[in-house]
């Protein structure tokens, strides 16, 4: 008499890992541009990480705000300069808004791009921020290629602009150029590297500890464990169906649960074996350490991003750290971003903005 072969099947809930640093395992090769990361999607990965780690994102936001400041002090007796400060381009952006976006891109991706628009008579000057994630360095290293979706690049949809100080005539008759700001990093020629690059790992740790807390809330702090199910399964497909039914029966996503389907006997011995783990303290300490390391990687200061010390907040400490940040980070970044703008004002519209 033929006997059906019974088979035990093991399945684990919540076992899929989310990518953190790469969006694709493939390596991109092109004779049109220099790739930014192996898959040419490094800006997307950096942006994704900034949306996942709260401390990491807060520091980037604060850096951009501190660098842009509340506005500019300038000679209001120069009407052309006043006009550019108040409205730097046809989109209605003020110069402060443009600089703030440049500072944000540079803090986040280590690169920033400023488009410059004028005409042959130099009768006007417009400055546009270009999203760094849309920009790639052309193979000749003299142009920047802009595309809306680098995961599906099409040459006919791209816009190419020359790197400053070269200008090229466009279809609308304007002369355009683009300035590439980048953070220096040895061994990297075409793109800059963000200063916090050594803190990518701890940013991921902070993100994962947040995920752990969220999963604990989603499961109402239910224990993880092993669910032993007595059921007869003729094949793997049948066993998988039984497991899926069990998952739906137990709230669909019951924490970290391992389901084991075994051949049933005369009596039903299905049971749940909890696995108790008292590691809240370890996770809390890990999160605190990751937060401290993120601040260090950014070359930033805790009190300037709303992070307290064990001794609590101190007005004197905040003022001291701001003074250090002003002289080591903020003023240097302001000068780096504004130096080309001052040069453009002098060369194109004859405005001296050195003061």
Model-based region annotation:
Residues 2-264:
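Structured, contiguous alpha/beta core segments that scaffold functional sites
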Residues 84, 88, 102, 230, ...:
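Generic structural signal for hydrophobic core residues of well-folded globular domains
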Residues 142-169, 238-316, 335-354:
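Long amphipathic alpha-helical segments
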Residues 201-203, 312-319:
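A short small-residue
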Residues 225-230, 270-277, 317-324:
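Short, hydrophobic beta-strand segments
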Residues 232, 236, 280, 284, ...:
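Hydrophobic alpha-helical scaffolding
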Residues 322-340:
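Long, continuous compositionally biased terminal/linker segments
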């Amino acid at each position: 008499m033929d006997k059906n072969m019974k088979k035990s099947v093991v399945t684990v809930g919540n076992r899929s890992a989310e990518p953190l640093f790469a969006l694709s395992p493939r390596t991109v090769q092109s004779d049109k541009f220099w790739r930014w990361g192996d898959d040419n999607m490094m800006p997307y990965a950096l942006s994704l990480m900034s949306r996942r780690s709260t401390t990491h994102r807060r520091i980037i936001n604060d850096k951009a705000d501190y660098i842009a400041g509340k506005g500019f002090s300038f000679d209001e007796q120069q009407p052309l300069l006043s006009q550019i400060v108040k409205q730097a381009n046809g989109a209605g952006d003020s110069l402060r808004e443009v600089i703030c976006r440049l500072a944000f891109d540079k803090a986040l991706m280590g690169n920033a791009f400023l488009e410059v628009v004028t005409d042959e008579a130099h009768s006007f000057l417009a400055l546009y921020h270009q999203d760094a994630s849309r920009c790639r360095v052309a193979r000749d290293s003299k142009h920047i290629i802009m595309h809306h979706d680098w995961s599906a690049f099409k040459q006919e949809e791209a816009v190419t602009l020359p790197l400053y100080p070269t200008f090229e005539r466009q279809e609308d008759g304007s002369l355009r150029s683009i300035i590439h700001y980048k953070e220096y990093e040895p061994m990297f020629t075409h793109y800059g590297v963000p200063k916090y690059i050594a803190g990518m790992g701890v940013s991921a740790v902070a993100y994962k500890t947040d995920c752990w807390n969220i999963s604990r809330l989603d499961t109402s702090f239910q224990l993880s464990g092993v669910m032993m199910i007595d059921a007869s399964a003729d094949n793997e497909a049948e066993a998988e169906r039984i497991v899926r039914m069990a998952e739906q029966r137990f709230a669909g996503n019951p924490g970290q649960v391992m389901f084991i389907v075994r051949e049933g006997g005369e009596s039903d011995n299905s049971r749940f074996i909890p696995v108790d783990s008292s590691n809240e303290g370890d996770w809390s300490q890990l999160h605190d350490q990751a937060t401290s390391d993120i601040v260090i990687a950014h070359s930033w200061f805790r009190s300037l991003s709303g992070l307290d010390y064990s001794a609590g907040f101190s007005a004197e400490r905040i003022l001291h750290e701001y003074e250090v940040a002003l002289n080591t980070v903020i003023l240097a970044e302001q000068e780096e971003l504004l130096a080309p703008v001052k040069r453009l004002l002098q060369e194109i519209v004859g405005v001296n903005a050195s003061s």
